[in-house]
Swiss-Prot record:
GO terms for biological process: DNA integration; DNA recombination; establishment of integrated proviral latency; symbiont entry into host cell; viral genome integration into host DNA. It comes from Sinorhizobium fredii (strain NBRC 101917 / NGR234). It holds the Pfam family Phage_integrase. This is Putative integrase/recombinase y4rE. Keywords: DNA integration, DNA recombination, DNA-binding, Plasmid, Transposable element, Viral genome integration, Virus entry into host cell. InterPro entries: CB (IPR044068), DNA_brk_join_enz (IPR011010), Integrase-like_cat_sf (IPR013762), Integrase_catalytic (IPR002104), Tyrosine_recombinase_XerCD (IPR050090).
Length: 310
């Protein structure tokens, strides 16, 4: 290994440790950075880290424009860290690889639309009643708790306290477990699902809380496929993007709308919502303030009436 590759490898590992200490999972990014070290070693590059070095590495993967932009973004932020130790490190341009399209804005469902989405679950796989009930319970939980879809499908039976209505969410996006209390109506729905699930699969293949029609853990792909079917049956497949993650946005927007209506101090309550949602930074939660035209209008009215205190 060359001296530069060794130096780079040491800094990459320290940078990964730093990101972990800040609460980030950083697994995919760590893989990209370690691959970059191997690339530098194979090419026998010497210091300093240059723009050309980074561009050639990113282009060596091929793939979609968004993948290249993501890899380059990981390197750009690492280069900023590396420059502290080697001032000759070249700064990478922010938009060297433009993304092919913007991420679609979240779609915030009305109460009627959410109800139609849940009602439509009964129409999928009518010969397998548990599948429809699984989707209905999942969608209700996503909408009422703001959990990420990945967090929901990873729930084990031991993570769901049906007596007290509390979920233990493990392996979150930022590597921290958290307790999530649910509403009494959600608790009742989870209890009903557990009874029906156990009747259908008295000897399940694993300890997952949500099961597929085969009796094993419902996968993220299974959730996406089921959601697409339900969306179509509900008449919401109308050209406007609707993803399971939009239910998380809806939860946050609904909660903040309620706080505005109650004339509560939303900024002071953001840390509470951030903890509940499992955000590492309050700024991530503040993003939801822009998630709804109605919410923006409400916040603007509060700011006007209260002299700027929203």
């Amino acid at each position: 290994m060359t001296a530069f590759a060794r130096f780079l490898g040491e800094k990459v590992e320290r940078y990964i440790d730093l990101r972990h200490s800040l609460g980030y999972a950083f697994s995919k990014q760590a893989g990209t950075l370690r691959a970059f070290v191997r690339y530098v070693e194979r090419a026998q590059f010497d210091a300093p880290a240059t723009r050309t070095m980074a561009l050639d590495f990113v282009l060596s993967f091929g793939g979609a424009a968004n993948s290249r932009a993501t890899r380059h973004g990981v390197l750009r932020r690492f280069y900023e860290y590396l420059a502290v130790y080697d001032a000759q490190t070249e700064a990478l341009k922010r938009r060297a690889f433009p993304r092919s399209r913007a991420i679609p804005p979240p779609r915030i469902l009305s109460e009627a639309e959410l109800a139609s989405l849940i009602d439509a679950c009964a129409r999928i796989s009518p010969g397998i009643p548990l599948r429809g009930l699984t989707m209905a319970t999942l969608i209700g939980l996503l909408a009422s708790s703001g959990l990420r879809s990945g967090e929901v499908v990873r729930l084990d039976r031991s993570d769901v306290d049906l007596t007290n209505g509390v979920l233990l969410v493990r392996k979150t996006k930022f590597r921290k477990d958290r307790l999530v209390p649910v509403h009494a109506t959600t608790q009742t729905a989870l209890c009903r699902y557990a009874r029906e699930r156990d009747a259908a699969f008295p000897s399940p293949k694993d300890q997952a809380f949500f099961l597929s029609s085969r009796g094993n853990r419902l996968s993220a792909t299974g959730l996406q496929c089921g959601f697409a079917q339900v969306r179509k049956f509900a008449g919401l497949d109308d050209g406007k993007t609707l993803r399971p993650h939009d239910l998380r946005h809806r939860f946050a927007v609904t909660r903040m709308s309620l706080w505005h209506q109650q004339r509560a101090n939303v900024q002071a309550l953001l840390p509470v919502l951030a903890t509940y949602l499992g955000h590492a930074n309050y700024s991530d939660t503040a993003y939801y303030l822009t998630g709804s035209v109605d919410l923006l209008a409400m916040a603007a009215e509060r700011a006007f009436l209260d002299g700027g205190a929203a």
